Amino acid sequence: PGERRFNGRLARQLLGIGVPMGLQFSITAIGSIMLQSANNALGTACVAAFTAAMRIKMFFMCPLESLGIAMATYSGQNYGAGRPERVWQGVRASSLLMMVYWVFTFAVLMTASRTIARLFVDASETEILNDTALFLHVSVSFFPVLGLLCILRYTIQGVGYTNLAMLSGVSEMIARILVSLLAVPAFGYIAVCFGDSTAWIFADLFLIPAFAFVYRRLLRMKRPDAAGPAGL
């Protein structure tokens, strides 16, 4: 009976963790919509290339997202067990795995992006295939930046500092909006190709010092109830 009783403190703590995580995806999506809208003004060829490239990019991004999700669980467990020093070990190990995966993905997309694009684009559409390949070549070159973003963001979320993780999504949104409003009208499709990578860089510029701040706090806290992080 006691376990089924409503616990206001626990509910507030769960909401403090869950709501920022949900808002983060909404905030990031706003920037992506802005970038797509800017690309739509460049013509049908750019729209088709962007659509095909995004499908392929999202497929190859899945392992990076999975690494991040694994780090959220790993860091949360070790934080709860009073072993925060292992969080840094996990970040280093997952970063190594990420770089190994990037080498493989870089080789595949730099050599076979046009071939893969033919799953979505007719072989006769040379311009669209070229634009799709250009987008993928730029994106995969910055996958280490994206991988670090996923690892650090989910690690920070895993130990309860969800508001800081959400702010990295705000950084991404700002970067994509700036690219959409300033760079795309001036430089065209090539600016669209660099839109995501610019957002990833902006997010990492926030996440790296944020993780350093969080990790230093973790080392000073022996137990997770020593100072509740959910409000940060």
Protein language model regions, located:
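Short alpha-helical transmembrane segments in multi-pass integral membrane proteins
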Residues: 1-19, 75-142, 183-232
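Hydrophobic faces of transmembrane alpha-helices in multi-pass small-molecule transporters and flippases
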Residues: 3-34, 39, 59, 63, ...
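Conserved active-site and cofactor/substrate-binding residues in soluble primary-metabolism enzymes
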Residues: 9, 21, 45, 51-54, ...
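Hydrophobic alpha-helical segments typical of transmembrane helices
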Residues: 10, 22, 34-35, 46, ...
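Helix-terminus/linker motif at the lipid-water interface of multi-pass membrane proteins
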Residues: 26-55, 59, 77, 115-125, ...
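Small-residue-rich hydrophobic transmembrane alpha-helices
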Residues: 49-113, 146-168
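Short runs within selected transmembrane alpha-helices of multi-pass transporters and secretion channels
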Residues: 65-68, 139-158, 164-179, 192-208
